[in-house]
Amino acid sequence: MNKLPERIRIKDIARLADVSVGTVDRVIHGRSGVSEASKKRVEEILKQLDYQPNMYASALASNKKYTFICLLPEHLEGEYWTAVETGIHEAIATYSDFNTSVKINYYDPYDYHSFENASEAILALQPDGVMVAPTAPQYTKGFTDQLQALDIPYIYIDSNIKDVPPLAFFGQNSRQSGYFAARMMMLLARDEKEIVIFRKIHEGIVGSNQQENREIGFRQYMKEHHPSCTILELDLHAERNDEDNEMLDEFFRTYPTVKNGITFNSKAYIVGEYLQSRGKKDFNLIGYDLLERNVTCLKEGSISFLLSLIHISEPTRP
């Protein structure tokens, strides 16, 4: 066998199999019009060379356009999902040669009807793929069942739902993250017997599946290693931030000896900025995500630790 170039080309395979380039192309792409004898020779050569098609070149040669839709929770500029959106748009710009485009639909994470309406709009468009941020499992399954019925691939970002498996998931293991956060909390708390969990709640609903799983992991660690530590809870309003300071004032009047707390959402800055405004420098606070206001609180000392993925780059992975 003559020496082959480092990068195997279709014409090299055609020469070795003694067939035309067109025949090799038809075999590689599973098209008809090839005799069994020629097909067998080509497949043997492909196997010997461990040939892998150049998907990038194939995509460039194709005129097909791909439309993806991403379903995200509604959010304000500068919040956690802003960075995720940035990553999505960067990915589309990076791989623009593949004729891809993306549309982002939004839903209210506290309103099932909002999610239902947004998902129905996506199904009507029948895109080539869907990215879902599944903040609530009870909202998601009906949607993904319909995607599967239409043979539309979907991936999860940020939060995973094991009972409804996607093509891929990009995010952290939320329960392990909460378990680790509890360990960090108790390194700060040492022998303290009380800690507090701060939540953002709307009509009894936590904003995301991810937050719930973080808390499950947190409580698991506490049960295993610090069962005598009392875990207090303060539920702040998800949509009425003007009342947060009053609720925090009332909490600390009721529990003046509590010196350690954690929040499992991305808005630790709400508590951090409150601590600054009240001059409370003896409170250890752990939060999530590198939002600008969180980082400012971290630098100024009102947040002790932030746990975060480098999430801006997550959606840009090929």
Residue ranges and their predicted role:
Residues 1-59:
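N-terminal helix-turn-helix DNA-binding module of bacterial transcription factors
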Residues 53-113, 117:
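Amphipathic helical "hinge" segments at domain boundaries
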Residues 73-82, 104-114, 171-177, 199-217, ...:
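Hinge/beta->alpha junction and helix N-cap segments in small-molecule ligand-binding domains
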Residues 94-98, 150, 222-229, 276-283:
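Short helix-capping segments at alpha-helix termini
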Residues 117, 129-148, 232-293:
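Hydrophobic alpha-helical
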Residues 138-176, 291-303:
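Flexible loop/hinge segments that line or gate small-molecule binding clefts
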Residues 179-196:
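A conserved helix-loop-strand patch within extracytoplasmic ligand-binding domains
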Residues 308-318:
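Residue-level detector of conserved catalytic or cofactor/ligand-binding positions
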